[in-house]
């Protein structure tokens, strides 16, 4: 029995549970929700959510994430594919970088009007000045160091300035960033192969995706819309924003 105070304190959770139940009844699919940065600790929570999923049913994932650890994203999509018939990733807002890797392993990507994927740009997570975790783009770390080296060569007197500007970056972080960047294409290919594509299909898709997802983008925030995604050959489609399913997804995300 729930006391009035307990009910009030946990009302948000009970409402989300009701929304998830209603969505599952309409679609006939299991639904899990991930609204978070992707880090290794996500795996334990995900396994808890997938624990009793029927592998003969479809699985829908509501995903909103700025990115994170690509290796964890690959582990997550592999685990989900083992627990379902077909995997649909629903993107109401953004699924960047590592979250895009996760989407590449799905059978379907359902995107809202403002939904977008992003470049596969590894994020380096390190302690900030306040002790909290902060993230920086691996590509931007390497680029910043490269530009600093060029400017110092041209003007050795600028060394103290750049040493101060890059005081939070050490050599280990730079090497980790370079290693993460070199792994990006392999992660993309592994994610594409998760849902059962043939080697030929993976090769063809990877060739189309390498330029827009890895090589070309200069910013982690670059937007890849549903039209771009379908143009690259991904199984993306626009959500029906007037449907009852989308109303439930929007309430869960908000």
Task: Name each model feature, range by range.
Residues 1-254:
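Terminal-region recognition feature
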């Amino acid at each position: 029995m729930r006391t009035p105070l307990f009910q009030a304190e946990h009302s948000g959770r009970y409402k989300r549970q009701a929304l998830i139940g209603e969505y599952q009844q309409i679609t006939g699919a299991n639904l899990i929700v991930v609204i978070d940065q992707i880090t290794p600790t996500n795996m334990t929570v995900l396994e808890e959510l997938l624990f009793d999923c029927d592998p003969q049913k479809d699985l829908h994932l509501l995903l909103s994430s700025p990115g994170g650890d690509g290796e964890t994203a690959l582990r997550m999509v592999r685990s989900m594919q083992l627990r379902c018939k077909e995997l649909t990733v629903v993107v109401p807002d953004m699924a960047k970088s590592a979250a895009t890797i996760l989407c590449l392993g799905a059978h379907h990507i359902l995107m809202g009007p403002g939904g977008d994927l992003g470049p596969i740009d590894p994020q380096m997570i390190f302690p900030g000045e306040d002790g909290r975790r902060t993230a920086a783009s691996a590509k931007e770390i390497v680029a910043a160091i490269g530009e600093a080296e060029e400017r110092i060569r041209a003007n050795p007197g600028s060394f103290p300035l750049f040493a101060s500007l890059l005081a939070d970056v050490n050599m280990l972080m730079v090497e980790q960033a370079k290693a993460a960047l070199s792994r990006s294409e392999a992660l993309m290919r592994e994610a594409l192969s998760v849902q059962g594509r043939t080697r030929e299909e993976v090769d063809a898709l990877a060739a189309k995706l390498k330029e827009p997802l890895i090589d070309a983008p200069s910013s982690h925030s670059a937007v890849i819309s549903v039209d771009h995604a379908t143009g690259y050959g991904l199984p993306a489609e626009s959500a029906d924003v007037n449907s009852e399913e989308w109303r439930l997804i929007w309430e869960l995300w908000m």
